[in-house]
């Protein structure tokens, strides 16, 4: 799948492009890889790479356990490396619930933090999906423009996203979010287009 997004934060416009793909190894195992890059905006990655290994559990294979790893390089030079553990349960349509914890090591300074999130999805792929997500925990670094960064702080983020297919392989996502940390609060919106490779 491919995604192109545009946004504006801290008085600076930014654009992000991402690519992702999933490979089915057998009826129980599958993997996923995503790569992405920003256009130089301070709050977007210069580039990032994330990979996941997934194992279907139970006789029904409705429960999926996930192990992930990621690398994030920011325009200001700091680097994040993370490992994540996740769990997803597919109820009878149209509900899916998900939880994840991520352990992050940021440099310079070897700042170690962790975050977690829970999410619920209503709807069906290739049609309409509504996703509610809440995350909380600590962040190692966050660029806020003008060469300034926040270091090792707690934050919370709540998002509501609509993912709508327009054609067999493409559509759009539209979402709103509420983000807060000890230094500022942010309310925002995001609009992006996606295209799923055949």
Residue ranges and their predicted role:
Residues 2-6, 19, 33-37, 49-51, ...:
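Transmembrane beta-barrel strands of outer-membrane/channel proteins
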Residues 13-17, 45-49, 79-83, 110-116, ...:
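Residues that define the transmembrane beta-barrel architecture of outer-membrane proteins
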Residues 1-16, 193-196:
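N-terminal entry module detector
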Residues 5-12, 20, 36-44, 56-60, ...:
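Outer-membrane beta-barrel domain signature
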Residues 41, 119-121, 125-171:
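Outer membrane beta-barrel transmembrane domains
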Residues 1-2, 27-33, 58-66, 93-99, ...:
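Repeated loop/turn-to-beta-strand initiation elements of outer-membrane beta-barrel proteins
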Residues 120, 186-198:
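Outer-membrane beta-barrel "beta-signal"
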Residues 23, 55-57, 89, 122-124, ...:
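Residue-level signature of outer-membrane beta-barrel architecture
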């Amino acid at each position: 799948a491919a995604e192109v997004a545009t946004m504006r934060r801290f008085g600076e416009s930014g654009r992000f492009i991402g690519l992702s793909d999933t490979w089915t190894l057998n009826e129980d195992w599958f993997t996923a890889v995503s790569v992405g890059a920003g256009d130089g905006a301070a709050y977007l990655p210069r580039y990032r790479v994330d990979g996941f290994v997934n194992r279907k559990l139970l006789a029904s294979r409705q429960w999926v356990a996930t192990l992930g790893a990621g690398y994030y390089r920011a325009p200001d030079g700091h680097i994040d490396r993370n490992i994540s553990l996740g769990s997803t349960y597919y109820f009878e349509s149209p509900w899916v619930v998900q939880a994840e914890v991520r352990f992050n090591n940021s440099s310079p300074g070897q700042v170690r933090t962790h975050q977690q999130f829970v999410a619920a999805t209503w709807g069906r792929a290739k049609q309409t999906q509504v996703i509610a997500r809440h995350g909380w925990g600590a962040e190692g670094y966050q660029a806020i423009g003008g060469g300034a960064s926040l270091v090792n702080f707690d934050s919370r983020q709540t998002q509501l996203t609509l993912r709508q297919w327009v054609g067999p392989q493409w559509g759009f996502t539209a979402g709103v979010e509420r983000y807060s940390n000890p230094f500022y609060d942010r309310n925002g919106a995001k609009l992006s287009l996606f295209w799923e490779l055949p």
